[in-house]
Design a protein with these regions (language model features):
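Short, conserved aromatic-histidine micro-motifs
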Residues: 96-100, 263-272, 339-354
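Short alpha-helical "patches" and their helix-cap loops
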Residues: 140-154, 262-272, 382-388
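Conserved polymerase palm-domain catalytic core
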Residues: 85, 91-93, 160-161, 165-272, ...
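Gly/Ser/Thr-rich beta-alpha loop segments that engage phosphate groups in nucleotides
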Residues: 75, 156, 238, 242, ...
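Intrinsically disordered, low-complexity and often Lys/Arg-enriched segments
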Residues: 18, 31-48, 175-180, 384-398
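Conserved two-metal-ion catalytic palm core of "right-hand" nucleic acid polymerases
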Residues: 36-206, 214-215, 227, 231
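C-terminal, surface-exposed recognition/capping segments
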Residues: 1-37
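Right-hand nucleic-acid polymerase module
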Residues: 119, 128, 286-287, 303-398
Length: 398
């Protein structure tokens, strides 16, 4: 997949490269890459449904849906008669009699309060089966700097990319002309958040986006079934479904293309509904903000007025759980508070015996692996002391 490596599939430079073909300034390799990109852009897909319904695909979907949940009762129950259950599901899909079950609702605080709607295990297998077919089609069309729910991406990669972009925009840390301290670095960041994103996704628009490439009516029928299994039959997608994560990326891919190709913004990063654009000019970013607000109306979305602002780079930007400055990065207070609450719950569960030592440490280490990307040495040191004291007391009392 050579055409993926240098953003030739999605960057605005594609059009410039094609236009420069006449004066012989581009190489044969570049012309070949551009041709491949054009073919990918124009290609449509039919006869996908038999592959989606195949036993092989459903078996793979079962493995993905059950990953890390092998001890859950619903996975054990489904696995007991795996072949029979998968063939039964296959038949439902082929006869188009499949109907998703009602969603289970529950609230989580991480630390933000979110309403999660969860599908039963059988429906989750169908979700994975759909994504197994669609992901290879759409993955080459996503921009490099879309970091949510993608292989070899994630928050850490997005933060690393942010570090690269801030150095480029500030010309490696040049100071503003009126700098009073060595921290007053050049450059600006437009930090934006889409208001009530998952609840605002227009289902008809989502189908319209899919139909540009997917010309198999049965696949569209199944996706429509999944989308409409929601409180509101016209808009919104449930947080928690595999399909929701994938469709969220696809829905905002139009925005990504607009920012990169039309606005020609090189330093753009998106993670689900949070995105940032870096530039040396505040006026350019103001213009971008206005055009993005207008463009989002086509997607029936709007920017969050309180969370979408332009900041001086040296003042720091809240992004993906950290406030990032030019020379350092600190963890958000609410994230630290949220973890400390979670740690109390983990301690209680470990003391009661509902989770073992390995499970306890797995949860702790997962958070540590993330927060160590900030300047959090003292914080981590204090939490480690707290955990060691708890484990020692717990071992003495048992």
């Amino acid at each position: 997949m050579l055409y993926r490596n240098r953003d030739l599939d999605l960057d605005a430079r594609n059009d410039d490269l094609a236009n420069s073909n006449s004066d012989g300034r581009i190489t044969q390799v570049t012309r070949t890459l551009y041709s491949k990109w054009k073919l990918i852009k124009m290609k449509t897909y039919k006869n996908l449904y038999p592959k989606l319904c195949s036993y092989k695909n459903l078996e793979l979907a079962f493995k993905k849906a059950g990953k890390g949940k092998s001890k859950k009762f619903y996975v054990i129950k489904f696995k007991k008669e795996l072949k029979q259950n998968l063939f039964s599901l296959k038949k439902e899909l082929e006869l188009e009699t499949y109907k998703p079950s009602r969603l289970t609702k529950f609230t989580i605080r991480d630390p933000k309060t979110r309403l999660i709607r969860k599908s039963i295990f059988k429906d989750r297998i169908v979700h994975h089966a759909i994504v197994n077919i669609l992901e290879p089609i759409y993955e080459p069309r996503f921009i490099t700097d879309n970091y949510a729910n993608r292989l070899n991406k994630g928050t850490i990669s997005a933060l690393e990319r942010f570090d690269i972009f801030k150095r480029k925009v500030s010309k490696n840390g040049k100071l503003v002309s009126h700098a009073l301290t060595n921290n007053m670095i050049k450059g600006y960041v437009f930090k934006a958040d889409i208001r009530k994103f998952f609840d605002s996704i227009n289902q008809a628009k989502m189908i319209e986006i899919l139909q540009r490439k997917i010309k198999d009516e049965k696949v569209i029928w199944l996706i429509a079934k999944v989308l409409k299994n929601f409180d509101d039959k016209k808009k919104g997608m449930p947080l928690g479904n595999m399909t929701s994560q994938f469709f969220a990326n696809l829905y905002l891919n139009d925005l990504d293309q607009f920012v990169k190709r039309k606005l020609k913004m090189r330093y753009y990063i998106r993670y689900v509904d949070d995105f940032i654009i870096l530039h040396e000019s505040k006026e350019v970013l103001k213009n971008c903000r206005d055009k993005i607000e207008k463009y989002l109306k086509n997607l029936r979305l709007e920017l969050h007025p309180d969370k979408s602002k332009i900041y001086s780079l040296y003042k720091g930007v809240d992004f993906l759980g950290f406030k990032t400055f030019y020379y350092h990065r600190i963890a958000r207070k609410r994230n630290i508070k949220g973890f400390k609450k979670k740690l109390i719950t983990l301690k209680i569960k470990h003391k009661e015996g509902s989770i073992n030592y390995n499970k306890f440490m797995e949860s702790v280490c997962g958070w540590f692996a993330y927060v160590m990307w900030g300047n959090t040495y003292k914080l981590r040191k204090n939490i480690i002391k707290n955990i060691n004291r708890f484990l020692l007391d717990n071992s003495l009392s048992s």
